[in-house]
UniProtKB/Swiss-Prot annotation:
Keywords: Early protein
Superkingdom classification of source: Viruses
Protein name: Gene product 16.5
Lineage: Viruses, Duplodnaviria, Heunggongvirae, Uroviricota, Caudoviricetes
Family recorded in the similarity comment: Belongs to the phi29likevirus gp16.5 family.
Gene this chain is encoded by: 16.5
Length: 37
């Protein structure tokens, strides 16, 4: 695996974790009012 491929994989992983993080945040904010009761 050369530097370019490694960078591409890194970018892909980063973008996917960020997307998952945002989805998780969104779900958390939606469920917080129910949890607070």
């Amino acid at each position: 695996m050369n530097q370019k491929e490694f960078q591409a994989v890194l970018d892909w992983m980063l973008s996917h974790t960020i997307i998952q993080f945002h989805e998780y945040n969104y779900m958390l904010q939606k469920s917080l009012p129910f949890l607070r009761r």
